[in-house]
A protein has these predicted regions:
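Surface-exposed loop/interface segments of Gram-negative outer-membrane beta-barrel transport/assembly proteins
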Residues: 112, 127, 240-362, 373, ...
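Short, small/polar-rich motifs associated with maturation and membrane association
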Residues: 1-416, 421, 428-430, 504
Length: 625
């Protein structure tokens, strides 16, 4: 034996090095002053081999042998022993000073993941499974602090591909063994027997067990809806220990971009790149290069010159003074309607703002403008308890994540309550309920080169952030890239929001009239709602692409789904080596009972004040409903 492992509740795993052990020590990992305590660990079937016994608050511990026996040396007075084993309720035993020999009988807890797997509409011993099923332990899911279950599953199961949007909400795409043709290639998600659940509404801390059914033999019972694989989640239930356990789990942290952006040309380098292109046209083609709209033509030093003003073509400082009389007059001539919306180039604007020559030559770093270190936090309070007559569990969770792109965020509030009641040894009833409210903002669903991140490398670095009137620069600069700048796109979304509500509730009853026969019925409902609001600003005032009017868009929809599942299962065993399970069942579903509404109004006078973003405040001309 080279090392012994001890595990106690949420305590970390500890390893203790040991050398050669004499027979009278019987595998005890530590030798120190104090008394010797002998424990015998068993369950209703007999001794338990490999149970962990730890003296709470110390590194004194050991593992039970073939007889369920554990010997601990150096146990202090008034010690508390923590006895644990996978699949059983962890017990804490307070030792009296006179107690040197104790017996501990462990009670079975929830399904042990490595022994029993949830498949289809029941459970099965893992050794009896012939299909492809991946089991992910809750310990693995907790390894990384994440906001959603799908993020926690990444890299935990073979054959499961997960990609996300990169935003704080962690919107994901899950594929099991490739792409299918039904249900948009998405796998079927089953939570506590309820199908088609929104997994992002499931708090990862509420998960008790997780199985991924991957091949046809494992998913066949679900029919066509399981063609792309099935993910089965069982949430935490109460215990029959007779004790109440209250726990808190939380963390604070930060979210950062994995890299510092692309290695792009800065403002001065971009100008030199244009100059080299012109030289190549002249020297290798023998042609006169076309003047650049901003940098003009090559000067007598065979170089280009950074313009002072950009709109739509570049002007030097002397040209501005010649045309307007002075720089002050040029600034005073600014008009937000686009007829005279001038901007200084980023180089001159940064010099004006007090930056050094070296910094000004770099121009605008759009990546730095729109990225940040986001703050993240997650908190959960949970309650578990119960006894022989029933069990209960409840949890309250809160998640708040700032995205690494400014203005992006994700919040979730969740409440879960599960309970069972054993009326007698034949009849059990129970319920599993969960409600989650989520809010997210930023990105407006933009993809490709219209996204904030894509614009960090499509907008030229010589374009400034603001024009001389304080509005966003960009759309008036010829060859500046997209009309929108990355910063403008991000800031125009800072007051947008989308809110989701997900309510899932299931009630079940189970009758066991004779040995081996289980009759179960479960009725569940899922209520889903979505509300969103976004104001798109005008083209000129804030340089939005392709819009001459601002407009407010609001969306609202809700949907109610029903599911009724009935199963009869009979399990028997013969010749001690053969287990046979028969199951028949029916399932009725009704999806899509609900309504969706959308409205658009134009011409909001105070577009920068979200308090005025009310449909009735907009113009009814060309309105859309």
């Amino acid at each position: 034996l080279g090392a012994s492992l001890f595990l106690c509740g949420a305590s970390p795993v500890m390893a203790t090095e040991v050398g050669d052990l004499t027979p009278d020590v019987r595998g005890n990992a530590l030798q120190q002053d104090g008394r010797r305590v002998t424990c015998v660990i068993s369950d209703k079937a007999g001794p338990i081999v490999g149970a962990n016994v730890l003296v709470k608050g110390t590194t004194i511990g050991n593992i039970s042998d073939m007889d369920g026996r554990v010997i601990l040396d150096g146990v202090p007075d008034n010690a508390i022993l923590v006895v644990s084993y996978i699949g059983y309720v962890t017990q804490e035993i307070s030792l009296k000073n006179s107690q040197n020999n104790i017996k501990v009988k462990l009670a079975e807890d929830t399904q042990a993941l490595d022994e029993v797997v949830v498949v289809g509409y029941g459970t099965q011993a893992k050794k009896d499974i012939t299909g492809s099923v991946a089991v992910v332990s809750t310990e693995e899911l907790k390894e990384t602090p994440v906001a959603t279950f799908s993020e926690a599953l990444q890299g935990k199961a073979s054959g499961v591909y997960i990609s996300n949007s990169g935003g704080p909400s962690g919107e994901t795409t899950i594929r099991i063994r490739g792409v299918g043709s039904l249900n948009g290639s998405d796998p079927l998600i089953v939570v506590d027997g309820v199908s088609n659940v929104d997994i992002d509404a499931v708090n990862p801390n509420d998960i008790e067990s997780l199985q991924v059914l991957k091949d046809a033999s494992a998913t066949a019972i679900y029919g066509a809806q399981g063609a792309n694989g099935v993910i089965i989640i069982t949430t935490k239930q109460g215990t029959k220990s007779g004790r109440v356990r209250v726990s808190y789990d939380g963390y604070f942290g930060v979210a950062k971009m994995a890299n510092s952006g692309y290695d792009l040309l800065n403002g001065w380098e971009a100008m030199e790149w244009q100059a080299q292109g012109m030289r190549n046209v002249r020297d290798y083609r023998g042609q006169t290069p076309t003047a650049h709209p901003q940098f003009g033509s090559l000067n007598d030093k065979d170089e280009l010159t950074m313009p002072y003003a950009i709109k739509p073509a570049g002007l030097s400082k002397d040209q501005v003074i010649s045309q307007f009389g002075s720089i002050d007059a040029w600034v005073a001539s600014y008009k937000p309607d686009g007829s005279n919306s001038w901007s200084r180039s980023a180089y001159y604007q940064m010099l004006e703002d007090g930056y050094s020559e070296a910094e000004a030559q770099k121009g605008t770093n759009w990546y730095d403008m729109v990225t940040r270190t986001g703050k993240v936090q997650d908190h959960q309070i949970s309650l578990l308890g119960g006894g022989e007559k029933g069990t209960y569990s409840a949890s309250l969770g809160y998640t708040n994540r700032e995205g690494t792109i400014i203005s992006s965020f994700f919040k979730r509030y969740s409440l879960r309550a599960n309970s069972t009641y054993n009326a007698n040894k034949y009849f059990t009833i129970g319920q599993n309920s969960n409600i989650a409210v989520m809010e997210m903002g930023g990105e407006r669903g933009r993809q490709g080169d219209a996204s904030v991140f894509a614009q960090t490398y499509t907008i030229q670095p010589w374009v400034p952030v603001y024009n001389v009137g304080g509005d966003y620069a960009g759309s008036q600069a010829s060859e500046g890239g997209r009309a929108n700048t990355a910063y403008q796109t991000a800031m125009n979304q800072q007051d947008d929001w989308t809110r989701f509500m997900r309510l899932q509730s299931a009630a079940f009853a189970e009758l066991n009239p004779i040995k081996g026969l289980s009759l179960r019925t479960q009725f569940s409902v899922r209520l889903m709602g979505m509300w969103s609001q976004a104001l798109s600003e005008k083209t000129i005032a804030t340089n939005k692409e392709g819009q001459s009017q601002n407009y407010l868009e609001e969306n609202a929809n809700w949907r109610l789904d029903y599911q009724w599942t009935n199963t009869a299962t009979y399990k028997t065993k013969f010749n001690e080596d053969h287990d046979v399970t028969f199951m028949i069942g029916t399932e009725a579903m009704k999806f899509g009972v609900g309504r969706s509404m959308k409205a658009i109004r134009y011409d909001y006078i105070f577009e920068n004040n979200p308090n005025t973003w009310i449909l009735n405040n907009g113009s009814s001309d060309n309105m859309k409903n």
